[in-house]
Amino acid sequence: KKLTCMAPQHPFKACGESGVEMTEIFPHLSTVADEMCVVRSLKTEAINHDPAHTFLNTGTTISGRPSMGSWLLYGLGAETEELPGFVVLTSVGGGQNQPIASRQWHSGFLPSRFQGVEFHSKGDPVLYVNNAPGVNLERQRDVVDAVQQLNGIRNDVVDDPEIATRIAQYEMAFRMQTSVPSLMDLSDETEETLDMYGTRGSDGSFAANCLLARRLAERGTRFIQLYHRGWDHHGNIKNASAGTAKLVDQGAAALLKDLQQRDMLKDTLVVWACEFGRTPMAQGSGRDHHIKGYSMWMAGGGIKPGMTYGATDELGYNAVENVV
């Protein structure tokens, strides 16, 4: 079958003083182009979503290996004992919504205390964080202490790391009864900040997750992973990609600006990536999965800003320069 190249469906323009080329469907992100390092020469090994997610998160398509967040938490620890050191938030909208398996933030062969904790992005991020009716904090502390004592007795006999994990999880859950309500109380955010993100929080949007990510980072969470499901544009890519971009553009740009304003960006690495790219050839009115050349961007954390690294060939098919 003859393959026909599909032209860019939205105009590109040079943005910022660096002149980074960005599509016009990201008007907010284009204002922070000078903070980005854009990598245009990625390749991957898996052409379907789930194994490609696994490769991105673990470095292999083999399930059961520790995720990147688990390795970082294992190696570096967290700067807080009041909240999980590895938190995952998901949002959805704009296209075909491919599922994300929870093993993408699993700890693999590392102890399970290093796995990611998924927060709900709408409503209460952690269910049942409040005490049951008739149970005050003092009584709850007594219950946790009694359970921990029993777990400790058993662990002295079998020396099971999963028992130690369970003990740590109970302690974390108890502390989160105070730390999570404080995390979600946005009364300390200015109207200007909320307007910048375009959200009032806890509405399930990517923007709300970006705001929550900044608050988690402020409180010492080591690794925060945001997923937005809605990029699988096998058809109607012109309209669908614009719709998906609109859902993430403002929040992502606000996160970079907010981190910069708070002097946190230099110590916080922001990575915007996907599991693979899309073909330069048409698939009807869309594009198929593509593993031979695609892009990502990073900002902060010591990354050199305002630059483009690597390149594909003239068709955007193969990564040919500084391949990653």
Which residues are covered by each model-predicted region?
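Ligand-binding pockets and gating/stacking loops
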Residues: 1-324
